[in-house]
């Protein structure tokens, strides 16, 4: 038995022991998907009846990293190589105006709440390469000679608190920590910020079930849009602890006021401006524990003031009967998202491709990083895809950009794609928080600047 198999056996045994101790003796049936990921993809996904379980199906890809010259597999006409290696759980990317790339190295801040589900979740996350001590810093990467490989790196900011989203507005760099939005003075070309940060506004903290907070500046620089995920799967701990969560907020930079922009979004992650319509788009990870086929994660154009269902309903007005008390008044107002890309695929990074230097077939759509499932059988995600757009809306079937993050038997993961960014040449950068690498995707005839 390999070392990874032993670790998985130990974790599985511990999970079983916790469940038995809590009185759950037949909790998870051998539940498997009954339809393909493709069936749960597109503007009108197939939504079968729920198959509820106390705990989700656990189907872990044990992390093994990349060895030697191993790398993800690019689509035909594309090439991939490592832009930077040896990072420490790189989660998010941000390009500065001079072409420097910021990398948020971050992990969950953890929780002091010791419920059975939380303890099980901690064991599972440890097996998929998450749940360790957070580096709590931002790394700067610089390619000085234009060969497509970062040859300079430095600790740009440290002593943060599970940082994630970043946005430069004028000469101020904003960073979304797990507990607050903070800002720092920025001078172009510097490789480290020594100045102390200033808190711009508090964000929901304490127990952080979904801890990542992302930000996106408005085109005029007056506003930051802030994502805040829910504190549970489906209000498991009551709605009181969900105050200010599962939504996108709008932060007015001049006044410091934070107000809700859209609600009912279980775990919104990346935000992006669609170039033709100017609409705000978001990637959202949906709920668990109602089967391998539900609920599809999605992207959608965000409507101001809209309610997207969580926790009372999903994908519009499909009622989640687990939530008590029910709120039929809110369900009646819930709107369906624009486009699904399969259950439990775990969307994170998105990047519109209008500034890409990849071949023309990849320049009118949206790149999406699917971090990959741990609770679906068979697994889903673990790839970077491209969704074609027409006139500002998804149009057509997604295409793979990068695959090969799983081993051939799908039992192990070389990596898991997370954040995306386009570098100054238009190449696609992909953060890989298991492989501890930032990958760079180009056309086969365009490997450098």
From Swiss-Prot:
It is a single-pass membrane protein. It holds the Pfam family DUF7133. Its main location: membrane. It comes from the Bacteria. InterPro entries: 6-blade_b-propeller_TolB-like, Quinoprot_gluc/sorb_DH_b-prop, SNDH-like_dom. The chain crosses the membrane at residues 8-24. Its EC number is 1.1.1.-. Keywords: Cell membrane, Membrane, Oxidoreductase, Transmembrane, Transmembrane helix. Converts L-sorbosone into 2-keto-L-gulonic acid (2KGA). This is L-sorbosone dehydrogenase. It comes from Gluconacetobacter liquefaciens (Acetobacter liquefaciens). The lineage of its organism: Bacteria, Pseudomonadati, Pseudomonadota, Alphaproteobacteria, Acetobacterales.
């Amino acid at each position: 038995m390999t070392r990874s198999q032993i670790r998985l056996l130990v974790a599985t045994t511990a999970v079983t022991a916790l469940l038995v101790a809590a009185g759950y003796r037949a909790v998870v049936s051998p539940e498997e998907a009954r339809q393909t990921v493709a069936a749960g993809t597109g503007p009108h996904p197939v939504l079968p009846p729920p198959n509820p379980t106390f705990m989700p199906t656990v189907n872990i890809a044990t992390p093994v990293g990349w060895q030697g010259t191993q790398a993800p597999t690019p689509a035909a006409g594309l090439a991939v190589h490592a832009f930077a290696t040896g990072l420490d759980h790189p989660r998010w990317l941000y390009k500065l105006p001079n072409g420097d790339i910021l990398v948020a190295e971050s992990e969950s801040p953890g929780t002091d709440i010791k419920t059975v589900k939380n303890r099980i979740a901690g064991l599972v996350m440890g097996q998929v390469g998450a749940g360790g001590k957070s580096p709590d810093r931002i790394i700067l990467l610089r390619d000085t000679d234009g060969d497509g490989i970062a040859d300079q790196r430095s600790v740009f900011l440290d002593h943060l608190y599970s940082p994630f989203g970043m946005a430069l507005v004028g000469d101020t760099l904003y960073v979304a920590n797990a507990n607050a939005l903070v800002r720092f003075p920025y001078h172009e070309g510097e490789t480290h910020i020594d100045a102390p940060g200033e808190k711009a506004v508090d964000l929901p903290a304490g127990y952080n079930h979904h801890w990542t907070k992302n930000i996106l500046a408005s085109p005029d620089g007056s506003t930051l849009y802030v994502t805040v995920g829910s504190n549970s799967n489906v209000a498991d701990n009551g709605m009181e602890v969900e105050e200010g969560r599962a939504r996108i907020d709008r932060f007015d930079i001049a006044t410091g006021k934070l107000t809700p922009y859209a609600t009912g979004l279980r775990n919104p992650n990346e935000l992006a401006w669609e170039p033709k319509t100017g609409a705000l788009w978001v990637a959202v990870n949906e709920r668990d524990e109602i089967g391998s086929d539900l609920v599809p994660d999605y992207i959608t154009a965000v409507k101001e003031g809209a309610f997207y269902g969580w926790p009372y309903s999903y994908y519009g007005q499909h009622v989640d009967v687990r939530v008590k008390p029910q709120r039929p008044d809110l369900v009646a107002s819930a709107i369906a998202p624009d486009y699904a890309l399969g259950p439990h695929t775990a969307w994170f990074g998105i990047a519109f491709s209008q500034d890409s230097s990849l071949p023309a077939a990849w320049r009118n759509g949206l790149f999406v990083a699917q971090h990959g499932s741990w609770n679906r059988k068979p697994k889903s995600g673990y790839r970077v895809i491209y969704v074609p757009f027409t006139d500002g809306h998804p149009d057509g079937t997604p295409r793979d950009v990068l695959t090969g993050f799983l081993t051939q038997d799908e039992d192990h993961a070389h990596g898991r794609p997370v954040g995306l960014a386009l570098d100054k040449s238009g190449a696609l950068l992909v953060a890989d928080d298991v492989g501890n690498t930032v990958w760079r995707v180009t056309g086969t005839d365009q490997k450098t600047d």
